[in-house]
Structure formats: structure tokens, C-alpha cells
Design a protein with these regions (language model features):
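Low-acidity, Ser/Thr- and Arg-rich intrinsically disordered low-complexity segments
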Residues: 2, 6, 10, 15-22, ...
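Bacterial N-terminal signal peptides
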Residues: 64-75
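Basic nucleic-acid-binding interfaces
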Residues: 91-308
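Low-complexity, Ser/Thr/Pro/Gly-enriched N-terminal "stalk/linker" regions
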Residues: 309-377, 456, 614-640, 647, ...
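Well-ordered alpha-helical scaffold segments within catalytic/enzyme domains
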Residues: 317-324, 380-398, 428-442, 472-486, ...
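Extended, well-ordered alpha-helical scaffold segments
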Residues: 321-340, 395-417, 440-462, 484-503, ...
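Solvent-exposed loop and edge beta-strand segments that line ligand/cofactor-binding
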Residues: 363-380, 395, 412-427, 459-470, ...
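CBM-like carbohydrate-recognition segments
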Residues: 374, 550-564, 575-591, 596-699
Length: 699
């Protein structure tokens, strides 16, 4: 995650400043052989031999199914945001035309029984027919130790209406989808090796995900780009209709491949799949009968073959605003601090006492870091976040100690970097971190000299007329003021004059520098004449944030289910991910830092800013990688506790975790929880003990 904000946010600020701104019978059958399923796409399906199950194992599996059924209907988490919330969001009439969790559970149990028995009923057998009310398509994913090894789907043809499927229509959808997924899994080299060693029981080792798609509904849009903006990527499926034939893209498949964010490309791919040229919608004639559709779906997934399933979405689960108690946020901040500290590792694994680096962006789908190590700008932001955490009395002592050690290690590495490998931003953030840590020589001296030279160069070059120049000035002023002796008083005052001009006349140019300016504005030694324009700048930032905040005036519990997980986020126009994401974290962290800087007696609170902090804290918590979302990947422990860049992507960039840690701590320090803004009726489970190993935390 870059410390820079996109041009879209700067443009929005500029506009404001210039305008005043039943388990089915099949689940009890384990005696069928796997016949070769007939694939619609002509794929060669390898038949699976008849299973030989022992009576003891069958009894054990029966107990697991009984437990799963009871858990599904009696345990709250599975239905926490199910039918009751769906009814609130879409009305009872919509409930009757969409697959329910009960229907999805029946499908899951039937498919699980077939996998455990290593046997699939023939399509002509009654056991293969699983009633799936209101379902027009089924997608099945199979994983081995978190790695996707098989996927299959089946779907009904698309009548030119939005009516749900008839009761008899979809009964073989599950059977066909499971057969195709298993056939693909058996072609996997690892599965083939396991099968050679264990025999016919290989499918019983696979974890299962079942997705039921509801009826197709028209997707309105003059162009592909226009239609794409109307889809809740990752939470809704999309389809291309050509005559009576539908070609669907399922959220589960898209998310598993980490391709859900580009709906426009998905539609283009579906057009090709339908045998159509990849051209835009207005270019198709009426005689071609081409249109777009969307569909809701429900997904059930288990992390292991013998685990109970849970309903999952692109976010994993929906974090309720009621969970945002002070205890929950403190536990989340402790988790982030521990995880971020654990991401600082020796640059050379053979030299544990040598220089330390910050790990790069984690790609959980491939279970690798891309790049392996973070850029200096990300390392500098991490050093600042860890330094701030090391001074926070809100965190457990062991977490603070580790945060201080890792922050100091990063500052030392940054100070030792040669000129071509670093930039002013890295030096300035590292310098502020060194002050927070109370570091002495030599790292601090090196940074002081660099910043002093950069200030003299900036003054000699004159005042530029772009956002990069304004950002550079803000970073230098903030770092020099924190260090105290990096520049002469005359040079510092001259640079401060330029910063005040930018803050008053060209505030949009300072969006990238919201974080260092917040540290400057929070400094108790800053003159009031210099603080006033900065305070006004953050009032503008807060006003813009409130204007762009998702779900303003509603709550996450009553929001549209398609996008309720984005409530509280800042919806930047033209965002690369297409949804509100963590790109706004640094600006919001600056707002929270300013609100936390002074007591109400010294500095009046900004009600607009404070009203945005708690909803955004929910949004941040929604992006923390926790269960059940992490269970769909190869290495949940490595992933758990990091922060996702976007809910429609899997990647966890280091800058997102750093900025999220700073934001949660600043929000706690601002006192908004003491304002009574947070609901106090959250369940005790919402306030877990703070983890110290960085691998577990709020679920």
C-alpha cells in the first residue's frame, strides 16, 4: 500500500475547496459407485471406483452430520446474517425467490456424504435428485489443505423471465456440479499421488464449498463499464444471456481465483464463452438477443472435511457495528501490533542479528509474498505505526516491547540505505518514528542530516505548483519539527509559511500528507498561529470523508446485504478496486490523530470528524483477515491478523496493516467510545483477549 492517495481524492477535495465547498435420501447412501458424469463442456471425467467403508467410519460420519445439522439450526454464527437480515434488507417476498441457508445446508450435507462415501449416485437414481428450491445454478469447490483442486458447476438454461426455478428443475444440479468438481480434482497431480497411497478414500479428505445461485435478474447498463459498476463484486454473480442460454460467473470461483474485482473483464470473458465477439453492449444487434443478468447466491464452506460448514461472503462474515466496543477495538489493535511486529524479519535468514526488513504483500492464494520484501516507504510507515504502538498504554506490555524493538530495527535499516534506494517520504516518516521511540544516535543523526539537506534544497528550488511539491513540504516540516534540530528556525519558518499557504488555498494537494501533518498538528510545541490552518484543513478532510462515507445515515445491520460489508468506508470516485477500500486509511488516520491530540478544553471536538470515526473503525475491522475468511486458503495462520487491501481482492499489503493499526489506536485515544457513540449490547465474544503471538485474535 503506497502512502500516496489517488488523484480522485485530491480532485474531490479540490472541487469542495472551489465551490465552498431435510438431509435428502442421498445423504444416507454410501454404496454407489462413481459413474462417469456427462460434462456439458465435454470434459473427460474419470470414474471413481466403488468405496469400501467400514461400519465404524459410517457411524462416525453420521454423528458428524447430526452435529452439523444441529449446529446449523441452533448455533447463531451460521445464521447470524442469514434469513433475518436478508428479510430486513430485501423484504419477505424476496425471501421466497432466493435460496435459503436451509436449502444450502441440505445441498452441502448431500455433497459431503457423497465425498465421504467416495461414491456418487447415477443420475438416473433417485438418490441423485436433491431438491433445491429457488436455485438455478450450483457451483462446487474442492480443496486439499486450502488449495483449490477441483471446481464444477451446473446451471439451468435461462428463460426470458426472472421467475425462480421450478421445484423439479434443479434437482440434478448438485449431482452434476459435484461430479465435475471431483473429476477435475482427480486430475490434480497431488490428488493422484494421495489416491495412489490411500486408495479410494481420497475424496473424503477434501474440504467442500457449495454455492447456490438464485434466479437471474436483469442487469441494467448501457455499456459493460456501466453495468459493472452496478454489481456488488464478490457478493453477486453475473451472467451473459444469449437467447435462452446463460453463461454465469460465480462469486465463489471468482474469489478463489482472486479475479472478482474486474467485473468488466469477467463480462468480456463470458461473452467469449458464449461464442460472441468481445465488443461493448451497444454494438450487439437485437437479433443477437444478448443481455446481462445478475444473481444472488449463498455459499457454505468448511475449512476441513470433518468441520461444520459456515456461511461465507467476500468478507468472510459481516462485522456488526454493535461489536465495535472499546474492548473489541483494543483487542484488534493488539492483534495488528503483534502481527505487524512479526512481519519484521532478518533480511538474511542466516544472520538473525543482522539488518531487518519488512515482509512485502502477502498473496494468500499462492501463499507467497509478492514482492518478498516491502519498499522503504512501506517500511517507514510500519516503523511509525509500531513506534506509536510502543507508547500506547492501551496495549499489553509484551506487545509494546516487541513493537519498539521492531520499529527501531526498521529505522536503523532505513537510515543505512544509500540515496538511490530511499526517498524524502521514507526519511521523514522514519524520523518521526525515531522521535516517538526516543532513539539516539546514530540513526537519528543520519536522518536529521538528510532532512536538513532536503529542506535547504526545497527552499532553494522555490515553491512548486503540484501536489508532489506540497506533499514534500508537509513531510519535511513535520519531520523537522519533530526532530527539533534538523533545520534553522528561519528555514523552518519559511517552509511553514509555504505549508500554511497550501493548507489555506490548495488543500487538495495535501491529501497525500494527511498523516505527517496530523503528527505536526498534534505537537504540543507547535505555535497556535501555525496550528489553526492545519485544524481547518482537517475539518475539510472530515467534511469530505462524511460526504463520501458509505451508508451514511444507516447502520450495517439494515444496509443492503450486497454491500453492507462496506458500510463506514470512504467511497473514493474511480477507485482501482471499484469499491471502498483501504486507500482512504491514511487520511482517516490523520483525522483520528488530530481528534486524539488534545483534550476538549484545549481544542473543541469536530462533531463531523467524530461521527465518522466509529463507522470507519467497523470498516477497518471488516478488512482484518479472520475466520471464516482465512479458512479458504492454504496457510490461515500466516494470513490471520493481517489487513486486506480490499474486500474484492485477497492481497494483504503491509501498508494497510500499518495504517489500520495507527487508525484503531488513534480512534481509541480520541475518546469517541466515551462519547457513548458505541453500542454496549455486543456479545461477550466480541471482546476476546488480546493475542500476543500475532496469529490469532478477534474472529
Amino acid at each position: 500500500m503506497s502512502i500516496l492517495v489517488s488523484n480522485d481524492l485530491r480532485n474531490a477535495l479540490h472541487r469542495r475547496s472551489t465551490a465552498r465547498f431435510s438431509v435428502p435420501p442421498s445423504a444416507r447412501s454410501a454404496s454407489f459407485a462413481w459413474p462417469a458424469p456427462t460434462a456439458r463442456d465435454g470434459t473427460n471425467m474419470t470414474p471413481v471406483p466403488r468405496a469400501r467403508q467400514k461400519n465404524e467410519r459410517l457411524r462416525s460420519r453420521s454423528l458428524v452430520f447430526l452435529f452439523t445439522v444441529l449446529a446449523a439450526f441452533l448455533h447463531a454464527p451460521l445464521a447470524a446474517h442469514g434469513e433475518s437480515t436478508r428479510a430486513a434488507a430485501t423484504g419477505s417476498s424476496a425471501m421466497e425467490t432466493e435460496p435459503t441457508e436451509a436449502t444450502a445446508l441440505s445441498a452441502y450435507l448431500a455433497a459431503r456424504a457423497w465425498l465421504d462415501a467416495d461414491a456418487l449416485p447415477a443420475e438416473g437414481d433417485a438418490a441423485a435428485r436433491v431438491p433445491l428450491e429457488a436455485t438455478t445454478a450450483v457451483c462446487v469447490l474442492l480443496r486439499l489443505d486450502g488449495r483449490l483442486v477441483g471446481a464444477g458447476h451446473d446451471e439451468l438454461d435461462a428463460p426470458r423471465s426472472t421467475a425462480p426455478a421450478t421445484a423439479a428443475g434443479p434437482e440434478l444440479l448438485l449431482r452434476r456440479a459435484v461430479g465435475r468438481a471431483v473429476a477435475r480434482a482427480l486430475a490434480d497431480s497431488t490428488i493422484a499421488a494421495v489416491r495412489a497411497e490411500l486408495g479410494d478414500k481420497v475424496t473424503a479428505r477434501l474440504s467442500l464449498e457449495v454455492e447456490l445461485g438464485g434466479p437471474l435478474r436483469p442487469l441494467i447498463g448501457r455499456t459493460i463499464a456501466d453495468a459493472s459498476r452496478r454489481i456488488a463484486a464478490g457478493n453477486e454473480g453475473v451472467a451473459v444471456l444469449r437467447g435462452e442460454r446463460a453463461h454465469r460467473a460465480f462469486p465463489s470461483r471468482l474469489l478463489a481465483a482472486d479475479t472478482a474485482s474486474r467485473t468488466d473483464r469477467i463480462i468480456a470473458g463470458l461473452l467469449l464463452e458464449a461464442g460472441l465477439p468481445a465488443k461493448d453492449l451497444p454494438e450487439f444487434g437485437a437479433e443477437e438477443r444478448v443481455s446481462l443478468a445478475r444473481f444472488h447466491s449463498i455459499r457454505l464452506r468448511a475449512d476441513a472435511a470433518d468441520a461444520a460448514p459456515a456461511a461465507v461472503t467476500r468478507a468472510g462474515r459481516l462485522v456488526s457495528q454493535r461489536e465495535l466496543t472499546e474492548g473489541f477495538v483494543r483487542a484488534s489493535a493488539a492483534q495488528l501490533a503483534a502481527r505487524l511486529a512479526a512481519q519484521v524479519v532478518p533480511a538474511d535468514p542466516t544472520r538473525p542479528d543482522g539488518p531487518q526488513r519488512l515482509l512485502g504483500t502477502l498473496n494468500p492464494t499462492a501463499d507467497i509474498y509478492e514482492p518478498p520484501l516491502a519498499a522503504p516507504s512501506d517500511a517507514a510507515l510500519a516503523s511509525l505505526a509500531l513506534a506509536h504502538a510502543s507508547r500506547s498504554p492501551l496495549l499489553p506490555e509484551p506487545v509494546r516491547v516487541q513493537a519498539a524493538k521492531r520499529a527501531a530495527a526498521l529505522v536503523g535499516w532505513l537510515a543505512a540505505l544509500p540515496d538511490p534506494e530511499r526517498g524524502v517520504a521514507s526519511d521523514c516518516l522514519a524520523a518521526i518514528a525515531s522521535v516517538e521511540l526516543g532513539l539516539e544516535e546514530p540513526a537519528r543523526a543520519v536522518l536529521r542530516d538528510r532532512i536538513g539537506a532536503a529542506i535547504r534544497s526545497q527552499l532553494a528550488a522555490g515553491d512548486g505548483d503540484d501536489a508532489a511539491d506540497a506533499t514534500r513540504i508537509a513531510l519535511l516540516v513535520a519531520a523537522a519539527h519533530a526532530l527539533g534540530d534538523a533545520a534553522t528556525q528561519r528555514d523552518l519558518e519559511a517552509l511553514m509559511v509555504r505549508l500554511r499557504v497550501h493548507a489555506s488555498e490548495r488543500p487538495a494537494r495535501l491529501a497525500d500528507a494527511a498523516l505527517p501533518i496530523a503528527f505536526l498538528a498534534a505537537s504540543p510545541t507547535l505555535a497556535e498561529a501555525d496550528r489553526a490552518p492545519l485544524r481547518a484543513l482537517f475539518e475539510r478532510f472530515a467534511s469530505l470523508a462524511a460526504e463520501l462515507q458509505v451508508g451514511s445515515g444507516t447502520t450495517v445491520d439494515t444496509a443492503d446485504l450486497r454491500s453492507a460489508d462496506l458500510a463506514g468506508g470512504i467511497d473514493l470516485p474511480g477507485s482501482a478496486s471499484g469499491v471502498a477500500d483501504t486507500q482512504s486509511l491514511l487520511m482517516m488516520t490523520g483525522i483520528a490523530l488530530v481528534e486524539a491530540a488534545h483534550s476538549l478544553e484545549e481544542w473543541p471536538a469536530d462533531p463531523v470528524a467524530r461521527s465518522a470515526l466509529l463507522p470507519y473503525a467497523r470498516f477497518v475491522a471488516q478488512h482484518i483477515a479472520t475466520d471464516p475468511w482465512v479458512g479458504g486458503f492454504r496457510n490461515p495462520r500466516t494470513l490471520r491478523g493481517l489487513v486486506r487491501g480490499s474486500l474484492v481482492r485477497d492481497d494483504c499489503p503491509p501498508g494497510a496493516t500499518s495504517a489500520a493499526l495507527l487508525y484503531l489506536l488513534s480512534t481509541l485515544e480520541s475518546g469517541v467510545f466515551r462519547d457513548g457513540a458505541a453500542a454496549r449490547d455486543a456479545s461477550p465474544a466480541a471482546d476476546p483477549a488480546a493475542p500476543l503471538d500475532g496469529a490469532a485474535g478477534p474472529k
